Amino acid sequence: MRTTMSNLPKELVEDIVSRVPLHCLRAMRLTCKNWNALLESQSFKKMHIRKEEEAARELGENRMIVMMDYNVYLMGIIVNENLSIKSLGKLTCLHGSKQVKISQVFHCEGLLLCILKDDDTKIVVLNPYLGQTRWIQTRKYHRTSEWEGRDVYNYALRYETNSGNRSPKILRFIDDFHHHPENPALRYETYDFDTDLWTTLDVSPHWRIISRCGGVSLNGNTYWGAVERNASAYIGHMICFDFTRGGFGPLIPLPFKARGLVFAPLSSDRAEKIAALFRTSKKVVIWITTKIDATNVTWSNFFTIYISNLERNLSCKSFFTIYISNLERNLSCKSFFIDMEKKVAMVFDKEKGKKVAHNIINIIGEAGCVRKLVLKESGDKSCWPLVCSYVPSTVQIKQHNRGKRQKKVIRKGIDIDMRHDKRIKVD
């Protein structure tokens, strides 16, 4: 008697199928109802995620979400003698029948919050692994016509740590005191997934959040670079928003002051940390937190690289030119990623030529620039690449309480076009 898959124990079938690469799962779903039911089971999802993470660790591969030219990709980067990057998938997020353009993306434990480029009336939260989405209507408070159609707000996505069902929340705010000190647009609000409501917060800031630093979420809080309300642009503090308490903490002094400062989250030995990259006309410095909570942060120096060392490495020409030009007011690096084991920083950048631009990664170690990776030609010179780490999750996105019909429509709104390993050009 010939044994078929249907005759095998469920646990054995799950173990076999969990070895299938992520980019092949979509094709398996379409094979038959039994395959689709298996792929939808929680036990299989957890096993598959665990095996994917183990495979990535064995390869020394860093998996991350990258936003380029208003599209979102899942990528894997291996930093070794044979430096390589591969595209693991592209996010297809549809509203109706149209692919939406995404201008910002925020990651929180497997969920992505995406901000739309040409539509300020809605945002979308999604779980790429499960293929679930939730579209959320925003509240509009346009004061000038120049804002029309552009989402000028800052965002953060995080879970409440004291919530039994771990429901996520969104913080949304605007404070344009820097541009309109006499009459700033000032609004802080949170969105609750359980109630489907926006709540206005009573905030009277004596500080100013520097949004270009990027907010970093960890341990139920989100952190930004900040300055005192009437201070200069040199960033010498952090400030924390506690999602559980629903408020901001005090200004937390930094061990440095810098104009061009970017934060990034990182995980090391199961401990969540924050990395801070800043530069002057002479050096690039990266610090990493050793202890962090809502009111206190301690730091250690990860490495310091002097521009003179970068200048000796021609593969870093596009990167160090920014520094020797002393463009302190315009930090080219909008986003970066740290590989703690290899002790390198992956700085996402845009290399602009006379006719075309390219999205690139400069991989920098303690001795200077290691290599430059060219990701792809860029069709938009003003859209800088953004990166955040990514770990798949089985967290279900709670849908609006408006019936099954809308839930079904929303689930059709996202798909991941998983391709076979697509190698990217390495310079």
Swiss-Prot record:
Domain F-box: 2-47
Gene3D superfamilies according to UniProt: 1.20.1280.50
Pfam family, one: FBA_1
SUPFAM superfamilies recorded: F-box domain (SSF81383)
SMART domains linked to this entry: FBOX
NCBIfam families in the cross-refs: F_box_assoc_1
PANTHER family assigned to the protein according to its UniProt record, in alphabetical order: BNACNNG10540D PROTEIN, F-BOX PROTEIN CPR30-LIKE
Name of the molecule in the record: Putative F-box protein At4g10740
Species the sequence originates in: Arabidopsis thaliana (Mouse-ear cress)
